[in-house]
Amino acid sequence: MWVRTTVTIRRWSEEKSGCNHERYPRTDITRLPSWKRGYPASVESSSDMSSFSEGENKETERCCWKHQQCPVHIIHSFSDCGHHNRCMHAVSHCNCESRCQSYRPISVAIFHHPTHHMYMTDDLNDLEANQLAITNNLCSTDRPTDPNSVESTTGAPDLSAPITIWRSASPIDKCQEGKVIKNIKKKKKEKDKEEMMVDEKPKLKKKAKGKLIKKKSPMKSESSPADLSHSISPRELVRTSESSPDSREGLESEDSYERGKERPSSEDIVESSPKKKEKCSAQAKKNATKNLQTRKTSKRKSPPVPNPNLS
C-alpha cells in the first residue's frame, strides 16, 4: 500500500552578517540538482533534527551532524546507499570551524527515491549523473503540481514548502499484523476442518451401507423358500411357522377372535337356558331307554349256563 509522507530537513545558509571566513563560489552550488540547491532564506525550520542524528556514521560524521551540511556538499539518505536507517549522511566531510560557522538552518525538502543502488565511490560527477536521471523520472510522477510547491529549475524554489513523497509501507502496526495473521490462520484451520468433515460424511455413509450389505448377505446365501419346502416336510414347516413370533401372534389373534365369537351374550344365555333344560331331559330319557335295551340284548345273548346236576 502506498502511503503519503513528507520530509523536511534543515540546511545551513550564509548569514548576512559579515565574517572573514572563506566563501565558496556559487558555481559549486549550481552543479547540484535543482531540488538540492540551497539558497538563503529568512524562514527558520520548525522541524527537530534529533531523529536524523542516529545512524551508522554518527561518530565519523559528528561534525556534519552537529552543524548540518554546507551547501557545497551533497546529502544522501541511507536508503539510497543501501542502508535502511532514518538518517542522512554526507558524501564528503566539511571543516565546520572554518566553513559552517557562518550558516544558519533553513527548511529544505528533498526526495527519497525508492531505488537502491550500490555505494561504490564518492565521485561527485558520477553521483550527480545518477541523481539527475533519478530526479527526471521522479519529477514526472512524484512531484506535486501545486504552485505553492517547489518549482522547477527556472524559478527559485520555495524552500519552506515540504515535498510530498510516496513510499510503500504497511498501514497496520506490528501487533495488529500479528492479530490479523492469527485470525487468518484460524479461518484457514476452520475451513480445513469443514472440508475434512464434508469428505468424511460420504465415507461414513459408504461404510454403513457396506455393513448393511454384509448383514443381509448370509440371508441371501441360504436356500430359497421353494427349496426349503421341498427339503423340509410339511410337519416341520408347520412347527417352524408356529414357533416363529409372527405366526404365534397371528394364531393368538385368530383364537381370540374365534373365542369371542363362541362366547354368547347374556341375552342369548337367558333365552337358551330353558331350551337346554328340555334338551338335557330329552337326552337323559334317550340314554335311559338305550341302557335298558342294551341290558336286555346282553341278557338274551348270554349262553345258558350248563347245570351240573343235569349232567
UniProtKB/Swiss-Prot annotation:
It comes from the Eukaryota. Residues 191-202, 245-266 have a biased composition (Basic and acidic residues). GO terms for cellular component: mitochondrion. It holds the Pfam family Phospholip_A2_2. Residues 139-159, 184-311 are annotated as: Disordered. Keywords: Phosphoprotein. Gene3D superfamilies: Phospholipase A2 domain. Belongs to the PROCA1 family. This is Protein PROCA1. It comes from Rattus norvegicus (Rat). The gene is Proca1.
